[in-house]
């Protein structure tokens, strides 16, 4: 059998397994502890944080580790609107109609609780028109969430242009870049 869905899930590279085995076997200390095992674990995490930061053009202190893409997406999509307190139901989110379910499901759930969500249409190539983002922004818009790369159709969104729009309007931009990291250059 040949597996063609490595963008969604893939085997761990043998070199990575080799590097990780000590942390599953002999160096399993709590990184928050001050003992030797804890310090070694903390050093390994900080090394990984620096490597991830370098990969995406970030600072190490900007990197937060989660269990995966879905948890990261949920943290942002639920966190930003709910950070507004009881007024969170007045919030507005802009996303695209072709997002991964890890984005669409939280948006649908937030809609059930009163949050307004605009689902932008895409063109025949799967691209979001940045002008549609501008036209959808309103005073209640708290976040724009557009995937960087679509793993089903291969579309790369104009994230740089979308980022500039979000900066201009002072609206946080969230991009699920799981499908893009390691395949196209990323500089946050």
Describe these PLM feature segments.
Residues 1-188:
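Pyridoxal 5′-phosphate
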């Amino acid at each position: 059998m040949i597996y063609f869905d490595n963008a969604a899930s893939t085997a761990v590279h043998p070199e990575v397994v080799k590097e990780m085995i000590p942390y599953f076997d002999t160096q399993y200390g709590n990184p928050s502890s001050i003992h030797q095992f804890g310090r070694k674990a903390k050093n390994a995490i900080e090394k990984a944080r620096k490597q991830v930061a370098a990969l995406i053009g970030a600072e190490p202190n900007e990197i937060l580790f989660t269990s995966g893409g879905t948890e990261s997406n949920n943290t942002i999509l639920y966190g930003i609107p709910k950070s507004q307190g009881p007024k969170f139901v007045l919030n507005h989110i802009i996303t695209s109609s072709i997002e991964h379910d890890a984005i669409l499901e939280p948006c649908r759930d937030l809609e059930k609780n009163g949050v307004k969500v605009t689902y932008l249409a895409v063109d025949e190539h799967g691209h979001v028109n940045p002008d549609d983002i501008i036209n959808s922004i309103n005073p209640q818009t708290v976040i724009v969430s557009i995937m960087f790369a679509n793993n089903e159709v291969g579309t790369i969104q104009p994230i740089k242009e979308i980022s500039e729009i979000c900066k201009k309007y002072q609206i946080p931009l969230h991009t699920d870049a799981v499908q893009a990291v390691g395949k196209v250059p990323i500089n946050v």
